[in-house]
Amino acid sequence: MKRTNYAGDTNEQQVGQEVVLKGWVAKRRNLGGLIFIDLWDREGIVQLVFNEKENPEAFEIANAVRNQYVLEVQGKVQLRAEKEINPDMKTGKVEVAVDEVKVLAKSETTPFDITDGVDASEDLRMKYRYLDLRRPEMMRNLKLRSKVASIVHNYYDNEGFMDVETPDLTRSTPEGARDYIVPSRVYPGHFYALPQSPQLFKQLLMAAGVDKYYQLARCFRDEDLRGDRQPEFTQIDTEMSFATPEDIQTVTEGLIKRVMKEIVGVDVKTPFPRMEWQEAMDKYGSDKPDTRFGMLIHDLSDIVKDSSFKVFANTVADGNYVRAIRVPGGADKYSRKDISKYEEYIKRFGAKGLAWVKVTADGYNGPVAKFLNDQVAQINEEMDAKEGDLILFVAGSFHVVSDSLGYLRRAIAEELDMIKPDQWNYLWVVNWPMFEYDEGFGKWIAAHHPFTMLNEEDLHYLEDGEDPHKAHAQSYDIILNGNEIGGGSIRIHDPKIQEKVLKALGYTKERAEARFGFLLKALTMGMPPEGGLAFGLDRWVMLLAQADSIRDVIPFPKNSKAVEPLTAAPGKVSEQQLDDLKIEFDEKIDYKLDQDPDEQ
């Protein structure tokens, strides 16, 4: 029988009509002469009714089915009895009185219940991902992701962009994260790399005259495992010739506005606010500021530089900073023990301690209160502090202070429920530094990437004798509720400027040519001024769906150890495959996928 409609689309307009439905048994209830089955498909659930007196044959089959059996049913849509109406279900006013039923597939007992709020470990859910995706919450996420992707294609097509695919097998040009490399059988000892982004190819498309490009690009980064990072992800990738930052931002805002309206039902106001990178770091302690709440950071360096608290005075004398946040009403909410936990946590950012005072009617209470008697009035005025507030101080370098207070600000706001739900605060962070110092690599790197154009007034910093690390770039990140969802820039189209930027990053001419020669050559052959932006589809969909994890909006994700439990990837390959690739190992390697490689 041909299906007439999805189970979840059954409605009051079909009352009295015969329907054919196909789906899974979500729940079954036997009330003696009546059996009720909740039939599920991707659009939702409808209640089936089997009446022993009216149709004993169908009743007998229904009596034998179990959860997750696949059924085909034919029956008539009818209104539920008044007391049986379920206002929480889309189909809650109707049910289907079944005339015929056929079991299309049976199911063993599943390893966990196929319901929202399932009590199962994430790895177990991922091992049986095809079952996990049957849960209504997960199917909603998949549908939302599909709808967003559809809007993206439609929007950029209407804006005159061309959907152009770029290679997935390309040359290794690692910048920051490691490449995933693919050995060549045809050329032993040579390797392709999976793209970390289509960056260089989309610039070459501008050189080709494509003018406006976009694609939903698959990207791969062999990064250290932490948080919600995924080794493979999807980004909405765009590039425009002859464009200013404002042009690119306006087009991007148009997409966001449409997605928010159609997906969330919210009409966001454009243009979005713009915030300088320096302001974001100074006031929010983050280059992805969360503007849904206050508790801004205040610089108290000038106020405490002459205090009797030597830690503060010496920090300022060394050219560093003393900054603080005020927790409204925090004096009664946080004990010394609570504050000590935060102090331990911020040590990971390089902070040596967390000073604090509680504001009282007579001044301050706390470990450093006696050292700040002469500064109480100034500090209170600067921070608008009132009796009952808690003030937290961090002293140190710019990044130590910013990172520490930025973390504290967000953690405390979440703990005290200061963030209103259903707020959608988009903004642009602009005017980034061109370069930043990477403590891990022990060298200067590009804050975005080496192909970002500097501000015109900062080009002189690339000349000999100047300090290039003072330069700022024509770059911009799009932020949503304290999450970076994308970033972009105007690109360098002048080969001389590109050579100087690579030199500032420590590239010799030979190394630059070996790694980026194809791009450097393209810059000499009529490269137009151009720029673009890419933002992560996965993270954006996670925020739109208000999901707990990015893994909840990816059909088949990797876990936090970069393992896919469903297929047990990564896996070993045969000796023959290794021989074909001319690959051999110096020693036997036998990793277990349930352990971290570093622990084996």
From Swiss-Prot:
Keyword flag Iron: no
Chain residues that bind L-aspartate: 175, 221, 448, 491
KW Transferase (keyword) present: no
Pfam families in alphabetical order: GAD, tRNA-synt_2, tRNA_anti-codon
Localisation per UniProt entry: Cytoplasm
A GO MF label: nucleic acid binding
The organism's place on the tree of life at top rank: Bacteria
UniProt keyword list: Aminoacyl-tRNA synthetase, ATP-binding, Cytoplasm, Ligase, Nucleotide-binding, Protein biosynthesis
Catalytic reactions on record: tRNA(Asp) + L-aspartate + ATP = L-aspartyl-tRNA(Asp) + AMP + diphosphate
Classification via Gene3D superfamilies: Bira Bifunctional Protein, Domain 2, GAD-like domain, Nucleic acid-binding proteins
Record GO cellular component, one term: cytoplasm
UniProt binding sites for ATP: 221-223, 230, 484, 536-539
Alphabetical list of InterPro entries matching this protein: Aa-tRNA-synt_II, aa-tRNA-synth_II, aa-tRNA-synth_II/BPL/LPL, Asp-tRNA-ligase_1, Asp-tRNA-ligase_1_N, Asp/Asn-tRNA-synth_IIb, AspRS_core, GAD-like_sf
Family, as annotated: Belongs to the class-II aminoacyl-tRNA synthetase family. Type 1 subfamily.
Stated role: Catalyzes the attachment of L-aspartate to tRNA(Asp) in a two-step reaction: L-aspartate is first activated by ATP to form Asp-AMP and then transferred to the acceptor end of tRNA(Asp).
Protein name: Aspartate--tRNA ligase
Source organism: Limosilactobacillus reuteri (strain DSM 20016)
Upper classification of the organism: Bacteria, Bacillati, Bacillota, Bacilli, Lactobacillales
Gene from which the chain derives: aspS
